[in-house]
């Protein structure tokens, strides 16, 4: 039985990465705030790229402060996708239901905006984490109902601290041996 505002988090550690998945974390204000802070802290010192699918531009300001937008890419004849380069990932996950899917990509400073737009990173983030090109990505899928974060194992301790914080808030955190992206 699921109680009001109860948050469940599953995570997996493998040889290349650490992953966590949660559903409806935005319904618990404290847990959502911790996730927002984790994503912002994780973005410091990294290049941040954002992809929104079926995200009306007028809703961008609900997800993050539009002052953090450094660049925007318009893809000709594609009204469904929006690509942004951000100065940081200070976001509000409570408004990710504005889009069918949203993803935040975290890179080191060697990757530039043009390289990001020209690669298949969007469709194969796990491959690029394994190759060391992508540090991490955060996905909001199913109109903000499910959240997925995967990063290089180099950042394992950051994720474990985040998970311990959620546990202290009363969230149910469980390590599992198998966890795959739910919408591949």
What are these regions (language model features)?
Residues 1-184:
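Structured alpha/beta or helical-core interaction and ligand-binding surfaces enriched in interleaved
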